[in-house]
């Protein structure tokens, strides 16, 4: 895939039976990275298993199964093309880990696509108090996904089919509740679709002659169109943070015979180049980058969004690990956090959270227990206004400013300076009990860490 078109990331959200998989599968299938051979293979398997009707969801089920088995699956399969963008689907929720993934997010979504089912009774179930639709939309907004598209799906199974009244009723209700969350409905495209039959997915549907298209208004420029694909094309392109200092959270560290130590991760901000001297925090190790590779090709530079492996000199696999963060030793190098203040929203905790609570935090690739050292203030979830000082406890639905202290060395940043390193999920009892964004970090001023010989040499020659 060349660099001609801009790459954007979307996350597809919505209730479990809204038809997310079918809709996503349809897009990947029709405009996507699935080659003919793979499709023929899937179709043959589907037929053999009596799924001969070949639902698009089958594509996605296959991909999910492969992804969950840890097969390094051709990431192109999760991509598709519009006339303007290469689109990558970051995660199709449905796994239990979706919320965690969305936060630790292999990346930040540029836009969320909310799929709601239009069928009789289905929409109501998804949006009810315990439906997932609300929670997903609230999460997307809290985590900084400011663009939204709503697909009103299963229009073929409304009563009567392709009902304009039903579409308008749902649009009105969804508008009201996304507005409560913080989205501006005027800037959100509402598209009536059938992910299964293909209505208004790539081409205007002949079944909904009443639909005159969607229109959105926003300060960056208005847009209009008919299909879901048009709406994806109207997403505002992201500004990628190449001008910020380097931050690269490590996903793994490999030892490769004849090459040495190779940390692997995704550049979140800044640029990584061979010859740079990088510091790993909280390990406090500084060394020179010998080479940078992506998909087995060496790069002269890696920019935000690139998943890369890079070879470092004189560092053993024991020195650095997943969850460490690499940065430029000469430009705001990353440091260990002594403590940090965060704004948290409690999602689903059966009891109460009080001072001293120490669950596991998932922040970028780090997975570390942190203590709620002080509950500073309880705030209004939407406006951020203070409701009370030093609350005794927090329960589901509450938002608060808290001071957190990591139980082990950890590197995090404030959301405003390095967004991907400033949002986290609080995990306990095998579920996400809260999400948070980091307001400020107190850095631990460490002594001199390990500086390898090659780093010293590189510093001298510069």
UniProtKB/Swiss-Prot annotation:
Domain of life where this protein originates: Eukaryota
Sequence similarity: Belongs to the TRAFAC class translation factor GTPase superfamily. Classic translation factor GTPase family. EF-Tu/EF-1A subfamily.
TM region positions: none
Function recorded in the entry: Translation elongation factor that catalyzes the GTP-dependent binding of aminoacyl-tRNA (aa-tRNA) to the A-site of ribosomes during the elongation phase of protein synthesis. Base pairing between the mRNA codon and the aa-tRNA anticodon promotes GTP hydrolysis, releasing the aa-tRNA from EEF1A1 and allowing its accommodation into the ribosome. The growing protein chain is subsequently transferred from the P-site peptidyl tRNA to the A-site aa-tRNA, extending it by one amino acid through ribosome-catalyzed peptide bond formation.
Stretch list, region G4: 153-156
Primary location class: cytoplasm
Gene name tied to this protein: eef1a
Record-linked CDD domains: EF1_alpha, EF1_alpha_II, EF1_alpha_III
Cited InterPro entries: EFTu-like_2 (IPR004161), G_TR_CS (IPR031157), GTP-eEF1A_C (IPR054696), P-loop_NTPase (IPR027417), T_Tr_GTP-bd_dom (IPR000795), TRAFAC_GTPase_members (IPR050100), Transl_B-barrel_sf (IPR009000), Transl_elong_EF1A/Init_IF2_C (IPR009001)
Keyword Membrane: no
Residue ranges of every copy of the tr-type G domain listed in the record: 5-242
Name the UniProt record assigns to this protein: Elongation factor 1-alpha
Keyword field contains Protein biosynthesis: yes
Region annotation (G2) ranges: 70-74
Sites bearing 5-glutamyl glycerylphosphorylethanolamine, chain numbering: 301, 374
Biological source species: Danio rerio
Reactions accelerated catalytically: GTP + H2O = GDP + phosphate + H(+)
Region named G1: 14-21
Broadest EC class assigned to this enzyme: hydrolase
Binding, GTP: 14-21, 153-156, 194-196
Pfam families named among the record's database cross-references: GTP-eEF1A_C, GTP_EFTU, GTP_EFTU_D2
